[in-house]
Amino acid sequence: MTNTRKSHPLMKILNNAFIDLPAPSNISSWWNFGSLLGICLILQILTGLFLAMHYTPDTTTAFSSVAHICRDVNYGWIIRYMHANGASMFFICLYMHVGRGMYYGSYTFLETWNIGVILLFAVMATAFMGYVLPWGQMSFWGATVITNLLSAIPYIGTSLVEWIWGGFSVDKATLTRFFAFHFILPFIIAALAMVHLLFLHETGSNNPTGISSDTDKIPFHPYYTIKDILGALLLILALMLLVLFTPDLLGDPDNYTPANPLNTPPHIKPEWYFLFAYAILRSIPNKLGGVLALVLSILILILMPLLHMSKQRSMMFRPFSQCLFWILVANLLTLTWIGGQPVEHPYIIIGQLASITYFLLILVLMPMASMIENNLLKW
């Protein structure tokens, strides 16, 4: 008798993806973040759905509706803070996942990697639009500043910005469309994530050594299901510690002031997970140049396979590249810190140096280190 798990048209797909999937025997905890991202996405969709039941996307009532959710809706406060802090956990997992891919050379799976970059952009767009919805001061001014960047595009810029706004400023039309997009995008992300997995399962997973995984495979269940459950428990623990003890730790106090177009906050800054890109944007005195640098800071990931000069896939046995990788991590943390600081001395010059270092490391220094390591192998 055939097993239903293996014969049923729908169960067969799930079985081949999560149960009988051959997985490398030596993948470390850095390979847990894929499943954690899936959990984050499901959590965000569920909490977001319940928030949408009580939220009103209208400039006059949006701020009040969020206050109403926190005060009057049963467990509304926990749903709201799980959603807000869930976004932070999502980005922590995302950056860890991308960093793992860079360190272990996973970008050589071209289709998987490129879908991943598209996913990153989609999640960033979703998070940005979600931040606008509570209609606090930072929501309004963040939306104004970031959408205004598109006006730097020659010839069509101004028309494009007004088209996105649905008027001559960020107003009711903007809020309504941002809510619509914020609702639909996570489902598009879920579909893209399935394509991401589809392409990954065509090749199988990479492993820390960077050599072929085919020599030693084990079934995904029970080995990696139990490992993923442990990861999930730690993720939920971290999220709930944040939500229940310091729910506003990562937020901006300005967002507890209702949006006021006549009063500009002294320091306009996005959520912490965009600060590194914001620092790169601000470090260039030219508007168009800043916008290009901002986009390229993420789009540069597409070039990773082209910039791979090493004869080895992973950085596991490449000390020079490892050193540069961790300098890049430190550099990104520096940019994150600078993005949250006011535009004044010495932060301006630190931001400019960190921005130059960021592009220099990825485009020049890391490929050069790879080539030096290749020559060392000849001995």
From Swiss-Prot:
The keyword Protease does not apply. This is Cytochrome b. The gene is MT-CYB. Keywords: Electron transport, Heme, Iron, Membrane, Metal-binding, Mitochondrion, Mitochondrion inner membrane, Respiratory chain, Transmembrane, Transmembrane helix, Transport, Ubiquinone. It comes from Bubalus quarlesi. It is a multi-pass membrane protein. One of its GO terms (cellular component) is mitochondrial inner membrane. PANTHER family: CYTOCHROME B. SUPFAM superfamilies: a domain/subunit of cytochrome bc1 complex (Ubiquinol-cytochrome c reductase), Transmembrane di-heme cytochromes. It is found in: Mitochondrion inner membrane. Binds 2 heme b groups non-covalently. A ubiquinone binds at H201. Pfam families: Cytochrom_B_C, Cytochrome_B. One of its GO terms (molecular function) is metal ion binding. Heme b b562 binds at H83, H182. Its cofactor is heme b. The cytochrome bc1 complex contains 11 subunits: 3 respiratory subunits (MT-CYB, CYC1 and UQCRFS1), 2 core proteins (UQCRC1 and UQCRC2) and 6 low-molecular weight proteins (UQCRH/QCR6, UQCRB/QCR7, UQCRQ/QCR8, UQCR10/QCR9, UQCR11/QCR10 and a cleavage product of UQCRFS1). This cytochrome bc1 complex then forms a dimer.
